[in-house]
Regions:
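Bacterial Sec-dependent N-terminal signal peptides
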Residues: 1-22
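Extracellular/oxidizing-compartment recognition motifs
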Residues: 21-310
């Protein structure tokens, strides 16, 4: 409890200081940015000793996942800026994930079509991040994401909108590098990000402690109650409507095989077992439809799970 109170007080003081320095005026973005590509960011900070305590504060106009030493910094599935009136700051104590020699921060960013609609410059606000805390000798340290980081466009994966205006994810599992968060592995097609400054930031909100953030947490895993097929595909119906995504476990799918699943276009890697699910978006649904190309056979579907996220 004492540690938690200390964390909150430290965070409050730091956020107030960050706002006084106009947190969010310094952003990084991929040099070949566009309004649909997903981007991976990564940087390793070397140390002589394990920091005594450390925090990460970050902001993004898009959707993102944040890791340190390959560990998700919280239980949230992903983060998103849910307000058109300001920029949300997310702050987390990452002390328990720290290593004594080096610490790698990795961020998976995806654009938000809605944000691009109400904020034309959102394409330049991919990531603003601060990593700070206390060294073993009780002195402070501070780092900010800048052009010393490495970034890479996630090939074959993007977020766009469908014909109805809803978000649609495209995920190509053939080109996804599962080791992209790791320190030891060079980032595929890595480049240095560009700095993208803002002269002024209005309405900056923090998630702690004054502005509680209703995040994207996994609440329940649901099972379908009925299955049927017709000319439109294979349908799985759940007992009730839920907000979230679905996770499809596949076996024996061919490399390059394409599946359409309620807002997701998934391209198979050809591994013996693989899972198709939306990683950075959600929607409300009660029935899902799986439609495949000529290589698809419904016997490839081993399991269907409804992931209720709110």
């Amino acid at each position: 409890m004492i540690r938690r109170i200390t964390c909150m007080l430290f965070t409050l003081l730091w956020v107030l200081n960050s706002q006084s320095q106009e947190f969010g005026t310094h952003w990084i973005t991929h040099p070949n940015r566009n309004d649909s590509s997903e981007v991976l960011f990564r940087h390793t900070y070397t140390t002589l000793q394990r920091p005594l305590q450390a925090f990460i504060t970050f902001a993004s106009i898009g959707h993102c996942k944040v890791y340190i030493n390959e560990r998700n910094i919280s239980r949230e599935i992903f983060y998103e800026n849910k307000t058109a009136q300001g920029i949300l700051l997310h702050t987390f104590d990452v002390t328990r994930y720290l290593r004594p020699d080096s610490n790698t921060i990795a961020v998976w960013y995806a654009p938000c079509p809605q944000a691009l609609a109400y904020t034309p410059t959102a394409i330049n606000k991919q990531l603003s991040l601060e990593y700070y805390g206390t060294k073993p000798d009780s002195t402070a340290f501070y780092h900010q994401a800048d052009d010393t980081w490495t970034c890479s466009i996630l090939e074959g994966s993007r977020i766009s909108t469908d014909s109805t205006g809803h978000a649609m994810e495209v995920f190509d599992n053939r080109s996804y590098d599962h080791s992209w968060k790791a320190t030891e592995q060079p980032m595929k097609n890595g480049e240095k990000p560009m700095r993208s400054g803002m002269l002024k930031v209005e309405h900056t909100y923090t998630t702690l402690p004054a502005f509680p953030y209703k995040g994207n947490f996994l609440k329940n895993v649901l099972s379908p109650i009925s299955i049927y097929s017709d000319s439109l595909g294979t349908h799985f119906e759940f007992e009730r409507t839920f907000r979230g995504s679905v996770r499809i476990t596949l076996r024996g799918a061919k490399k390059g095989e394409r599946l359409e699943i309620n807002g997701l276009l998934y391209i198979c890697s050809g591994e013996m077992d693989e899972q198709a699910f939306r990683r950075l978006t959600t929607s409300r649904q009660k029935t899902i439809t799986i439609k495949g190309d000529r290589y698809f056979d419904k016997s490839q579907i081993q399991k269907v799970e409804g992931l209720e996220i709110y």
